Each structure stands twice: as structure tokens, then as C-alpha cells.
């Protein structure tokens, strides 16, 4: 087994959390605490030292999520999401899960710190993993292929959401090998079913759903 040294996560500090909070947008999860509210609590100078202390505490939680196996009952509220029903063209309903803003802040800070690890793990197969100009390069490459008179091709558009079809346990097992520094954080986040709240009922998600 690959041993991950917790010291690598020391870069996640109050400043990293503040930068992450400044780049978060959108509504809140079950607590309804949206991005603007968290941004104000963490980044506003009006709160003085309390904002810095909050950033430090969130950073400490982030580092624990990256380096320790935390009992799920201790973080189940953080991993919960609020379901919003979206009406589709065929009049059916598609549930979209809105996760807690705090979880998104932590995730962004962790991903930012492990950017190079994620880039190495995903390679050229995933242009959305942080590779600069990756999507633009892919578009230009396809254009060159189509404009080549010697080329005959058909492009098949993958319109399905791969995250919805993902087997969590298999994915976590693979991540442990190809990106070990990220494994514990993802394991704490996705090993257990997430509570999904919608109106007056709550159900448990055993398969992935869309997260905002």
C-alpha cells in the first residue's frame, strides 16, 4: 500500500479556505446557507479575527478529511444534499442535488492543493481536470481532423452524465492506486450513502446523483 504523509496537506490553511470561498457561487444545501453568506463570514473584514478563526477551523476539518478515516455519522450532515426537482421536456422530473456550500468550499481547497496529482492521474483523457487550455486544444484538434480532406469521420456525442453511472466502490479502489493523495478525502465523501432532503421527506442515496 502507498503511504500518504499527512504533512502534504499543511498547505490547506485559512488563506486557502478564503480563496476557495471567494470562488464559490450558488445556493445552499439542506441548511440553505448560500455561497454569499459563507463568503461574508470567512472573508469579510467586518468580522475581524472571527473570520480568520473560522477559516482556520475549516482548514483543520479539510486536513482531517484528507488524512483520517472519519466515522460517517460525524460528517453525514456535511455530506447531505437538498433535492430540487427539474421538469424535463417529457414532463418527467429530474432530481438535482445541491450540496452544502461548506462542502464545496472544502472540496475546492483540496482540489486546488492537489491539482498536480489530479492532472497526473487523469492525464490527457480528461480535459476538465485543470489542464490549461485542455478543452480549447481538443476543439482545435477535432477541427483540424474534420478539415483534412483525407479524413472521413463520425463524431458520437456522449450526452450521458458519467457521474450518475459511476460505481463508487470501484472508483474509490482505482483512485487509491492512481491518485493516493486524494483517496482518503473521496473515501470520506463517497463511501457511504448520502442523505437527500426534498420538501417533507428524506431519502438515502446509494447511487450518485447530480451535485451542484
Where are these regions (language model features)?
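Conserved pre-catalytic core of RNA-dependent polymerases
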Residues: 3-212
Amino acid at each position: 500500500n502507498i503511504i500518504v504523509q499527512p504533512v502534504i496537506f499543511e498547505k490547506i490553511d485559512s488563506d486557502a479556505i478564503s480563496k476557495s470561498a471567494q470562488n464559490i457561487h450558488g445556493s445552499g444545501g439542506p441548511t440553505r446557507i448560500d455561497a454569499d453568506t459563507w463568503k461574508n463570514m470567512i472573508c469579510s473584514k467586518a468580522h475581524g479575527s472571527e473570520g480568520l478563526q473560522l477559516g482556520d477551523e475549516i482548514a483543520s476539518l479539510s486536513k482531517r478529511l484528507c488524512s483520517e478515516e472519519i466515522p460517517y455519522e460525524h460528517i453525514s450532515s456535511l455530506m447531505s444534499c437538498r433535492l430540487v426537482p427539474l421538469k424535463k421536456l417529457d414532463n418527467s422530473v429530474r432530481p438535482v442535488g445541491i450540496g452544502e456550500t461548506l462542502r464545496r468550499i472544502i472540496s475546492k481547497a483540496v482540489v486546488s492543493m492537489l491539482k498536480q496529482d489530479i492532472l497526473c492521474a487523469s492525464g490527457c483523457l480528461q480535459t476538465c481536470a485543470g489542464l490549461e487550455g485542455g478543452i480549447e486544444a481538443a476543439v482545435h484538434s477535432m477541427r483540424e481532423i474534420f478539415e483534412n480532406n483525407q479524413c472521413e469521420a463520425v463524431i458520437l456525442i456522449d450526452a450521458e452524465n458519467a457521474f450518475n453511472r459511476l460505481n463508487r466502490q470501484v472508483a474509490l479502489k482505482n483512485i487509491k492506486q492512481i491518485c493516493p493523495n486524494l483517496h482518503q478525502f473521496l473515501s470520506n465523501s463517497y463511501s457511504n450513502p448520502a442523505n437527500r432532503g426534498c420538501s417533507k421527506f428524506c431519502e438515502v442515496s446509494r447511487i450518485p446523483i447530480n451535485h451542484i
